[in-house]
A protein has these predicted regions:
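Short hydrophobic/aromatic patch on the recognition helix
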Residues: 39-49
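Short, hydrophobic secondary-structure boundary micro-motifs
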Residues: 104-106, 173-176
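Hydrophobic alpha-helical connector segments
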Residues: 58, 73-101, 183-186
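C-terminal peripheral helix-coil segments that are non-catalytic and often amphipathic
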Residues: 94, 158-173, 182-221
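Basic, helix-initiating cap at the start of DNA-binding domains
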Residues: 1-24, 28-40, 54
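Amphipathic alpha-helical packing segments from all-alpha helical-bundle domains
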Residues: 116-170, 180-181
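Alpha-helical DNA-contacting segments of helix-turn-helix folds
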Residues: 57-63, 70
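Helix-loop "lid/cap" segments that line or gate small-molecule binding pockets
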Residues: 90-97, 107-115, 131-136, 214-219
Length: 221
């Protein structure tokens, strides 16, 4: 209880939200359970966040911003290509290990399309198009909710795209036809790998070295 009281109301709510969303996913999470764990009033939660979606977004956005700040240091454009690649993969694995369940929930919110539609990136517009594969067109509210989560994931993948593009431009990496797709596969594949591993003796530097080897040997001239 003492630790709870040392935190601000917002911090207690976000910490409780992380516990509940990580354990139950988005759909089954309830504000009532979050309120109980945070040891605060319902009115306080609604005052700061309004609804479950905005609370989840605030939690995810905060973690995303902190992650991107770390990547700015470890993947600084002034660093050599291999250092940037290694730095990205190391920070990514550390981040996923810490937030693996929460980021799986994020992916479901951003990508899962039970209503039969998804986003497709449009290079000319530099924006997302809606691809309705079956069923009816989504409402503007549905598009807005899913888009903000999709853009969070894209912001993280974009860092790897930039690094690999540098490798291509400098002649270290051969041209890649669909660079964003390759970067996304590396990113999402890492989340799946971390989510499914039961190893207690993970050596991040060794794992990163293996990933760098696979990436470079797959695309090296």
């Amino acid at each position: 209880m003492a630790e709870k009281q040392e935190l601000s109301k917002e911090q207690r709510i976000l910490r409780a939200a992380e516990q509940v969303f990580s354990r139950k996913g988005y759909t089954d999470a309830t504000l009532d359970e979050i309120i109980k764990i945070a040891d605060t009033g319902k009115g306080t939660v609604y005052k700061y966040y309004g609804n479950k979606d905005f609370l989840f977004y605030t939690l995810i956005h905060g973690k995303n911003e902190a992650f991107l700040d770390k990547l700015k240091v470890s993947c600084d454009a002034k660093l050599p290509f291999m250092d940037r690649l290694h730095g990205f993969l190391l920070e990514m694995l550390k981040f996923i290990i810490k937030n693996k369940m929460l980021w799986r929930v994020l992916i479901v919110q951003a990508i899962a399309a039970p209503s039969g539609w998804c986003f497709v990136w449009n290079d000319k517009k530099h924006d997302l198009d809606i691809d309705v594969q079956w069923g009816s067109k989504p409402t503007p509210e549905e598009v807005a909710i899913k888009k903000k989560y999709t853009m969070i994931l894209r912001s993280e993948i974009a860092v790897l795209v930039d690094i690999l593009q540098e490798g291509i431009d400098s002649g270290i990496v051969k041209p890649i036809i669909d660079l964003p797709l390759v970067a996304a596969n590396i990113f999402f594949g890492s989340i799946v790998m971390i989510s499914q591993t039961r190893r207690a003796d993970i050596n991040l530097n060794e794992d990163v070295d293996i990933m760098v080897d696979r990436i470079m040997n797959g695309h090296k001239k």
